[in-house]
Amino acid sequence: MALYSIESEQCLGMSHSGAVTVNGESAVELSDEEVDILVRLIKEKDSTDVKELDLENFHPDIYKKLDEAYYQMAYDAEEIHWLWEGYYNGCFEYDDDGLMAYCEKELGFSFEFKPEEYFDEDDLEYYKEDPESYEDEIYDVKCEAFHEWLSDYVSGLSDDEARDFFYNHMDADLNLDDVEYTVEIPQTIIAKAQQ
């Protein structure tokens, strides 16, 4: 068994700036025997088109492996695109306090409130008489600091790390029912057949 690299490019539609495309990269595991079958078919039929090779009917096991690999690659590429879009457009409805507490405990977010940086003496006198408003102000300042920290933290994540973070801690909810993809022969195998 060996891993063969596969790639894809999908157009998700149009935006005001042109076509929105996503690229996927993955790998499919095939045995030497399966690779030999593909090489032989490509040479015999002088084609690399999966439909023309009729893999689905005559070699369903190979077709299934390729189909699953290309589908998963396309799904992953489209999924992470929409997750990032959802994050940047504020579409996730998560518990702000819960996320802030998690990030303080597990990820290093810390907040130290220094009244002199935010309030002058008159403000502080006012808040002495209204401690509840003072606590509200501190909370608002902390939330603002947290969102700045969160933006920096998330922008430093890889796609896989971001995917996990969005689902596990920001209540991302995404259902992709209709992922478009094509099943192809890995380029390395095509090159082998053309030698």
Predicted regions span which residues?
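Short acidic DE-rich linear segments
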Residues: A191-Q195
